[in-house]
């Protein structure tokens, strides 16, 4: 006997679909506006979604190409956007790799080893992670100012110092990977030990291949967080050529003149490395899930 949908059920389905469309519009519309502003003539934040006279002026300036005006004058790129983009990718890439390495080894120790004070350390790490980095800006500046006197490449206005500062925020990632490790059956490592594998070999050859999905997630989250981070980077970096893109983009928005078009083009460029890394990591994520299912 065929089931007949009541009107109330249909209305709920329609309401759900309408809510989803509204939610998508709230997400997509601002992104489309940013793209539209980057193709408008002039530096105006308001205007139609589809520019009447599309222009590549802002994109050329963002890519480091001088623009020739109608009167014959030449407008040089105001800021080294591509240098900022490279700085962001370099800092985010190195930081993410180091965070994954440190978080993985630390999580393995907390998940598989027994030592005094383990629970206390875990809880303390989580409590300290709850405090925002903004509260420690003064301390960070004083710390890296002093550190730079002994280790110059870890001092102020260095990417090494910035990367080192980001490594202090791995507590959440340690907890995440630790939880994943605890879902993996210990019998796999015990079987490897019976075959003569050392704890390091069992960790590297058994546990890590099964943990590719969570490692990919941690890498993505770390990369996104570093690319978009502003307070610490703006504190430690003072040279314009050493800025990351998130910090450098603020140079377009000064009280005398808001360069919205140039800012929008730089904003779209800042999304490219995140998108590329996510797509690449997504491939590894799916591969890791499949491999883990077969080996398990």
Curated annotation (Swiss-Prot):
<dbReference type="GO" id="GO:0005886">
    <property type="term" value="C:plasma membrane"/>
</dbReference>
<comment type="similarity">
    <text>Belongs to the binding-protein-dependent transport system permease family. MalFG subfamily.</text>
</comment>
<keyword id="KW-0812">Transmembrane</keyword>
<feature type="transmembrane region" description="Helical">
    <location>
        <begin position="89"/>
        <end position="111"/>
    </location>
</feature>
<dbReference type="GO" id="GO:0042956">
    <property type="term" value="P:maltodextrin transmembrane transport"/>
</dbReference>
<dbReference type="InterPro" id="IPR050901">
    <property type="entry name" value="BP-dep_ABC_trans_perm"/>
</dbReference>
<keyword id="KW-0762">Sugar transport</keyword>
<feature type="transmembrane region" description="Helical">
    <location>
        <begin position="258"/>
        <end position="280"/>
    </location>
</feature>
<feature type="transmembrane region" description="Helical">
    <location>
        <begin position="205"/>
        <end position="227"/>
    </location>
</feature>
<dbReference type="GO" id="GO:0015768">
    <property type="term" value="P:maltose transport"/>
</dbReference>
<feature type="topological domain" description="Periplasmic">
    <location>
        <begin position="228"/>
        <end position="257"/>
    </location>
</feature>
<feature type="topological domain" description="Cytoplasmic">
    <location>
        <begin position="281"/>
        <end position="296"/>
    </location>
</feature>
<feature type="topological domain" description="Cytoplasmic">
    <location>
        <begin position="1"/>
        <end position="12"/>
    </location>
</feature>
<keyword id="KW-0472">Membrane</keyword>
<comment type="subunit">
    <text>The complex is composed of two ATP-binding proteins (MalK), two transmembrane proteins (MalG and MalF) and a solute-binding protein (MalE).</text>
</comment>
<feature type="topological domain" description="Periplasmic">
    <location>
        <begin position="36"/>
        <end position="88"/>
    </location>
</feature>
<dbReference type="InterPro" id="IPR035906">
    <property type="entry name" value="MetI-like_sf"/>
</dbReference>
<feature type="topological domain" description="Cytoplasmic">
    <location>
        <begin position="176"/>
        <end position="204"/>
    </location>
</feature>
<comment type="function">
    <text>Part of the ABC transporter complex MalEFGK involved in maltose/maltodextrin import. Probably responsible for the translocation of the substrate across the membrane.</text>
</comment>
<feature type="topological domain" description="Cytoplasmic">
    <location>
        <begin position="112"/>
        <end position="123"/>
    </location>
</feature>
<keyword id="KW-1133">Transmembrane helix</keyword>
<feature type="transmembrane region" description="Helical">
    <location>
        <begin position="13"/>
        <end position="35"/>
    </location>
</feature>
<keyword id="KW-0997">Cell inner membrane</keyword>
<keyword id="KW-1003">Cell membrane</keyword>
<feature type="domain" description="ABC transmembrane type-1">
    <location>
        <begin position="85"/>
        <end position="281"/>
    </location>
</feature>
<feature type="transmembrane region" description="Helical">
    <location>
        <begin position="153"/>
        <end position="175"/>
    </location>
</feature>
<keyword id="KW-0813">Transport</keyword>
<protein>
    <recommendedName>
        <fullName>Maltose/maltodextrin transport system permease protein MalG</fullName>
    </recommendedName>
</protein>
<feature type="transmembrane region" description="Helical">
    <location>
        <begin position="124"/>
        <end position="143"/>
    </location>
</feature>
<dbReference type="GO" id="GO:0015423">
    <property type="term" value="F:ABC-type maltose transporter activity"/>
</dbReference>
<feature type="topological domain" description="Periplasmic">
    <location>
        <begin position="144"/>
        <end position="152"/>
    </location>
</feature>
<dbReference type="Pfam" id="PF00528">
    <property type="entry name" value="BPD_transp_1"/>
</dbReference>
<dbReference type="InterPro" id="IPR000515">
    <property type="entry name" value="MetI-like"/>
</dbReference>
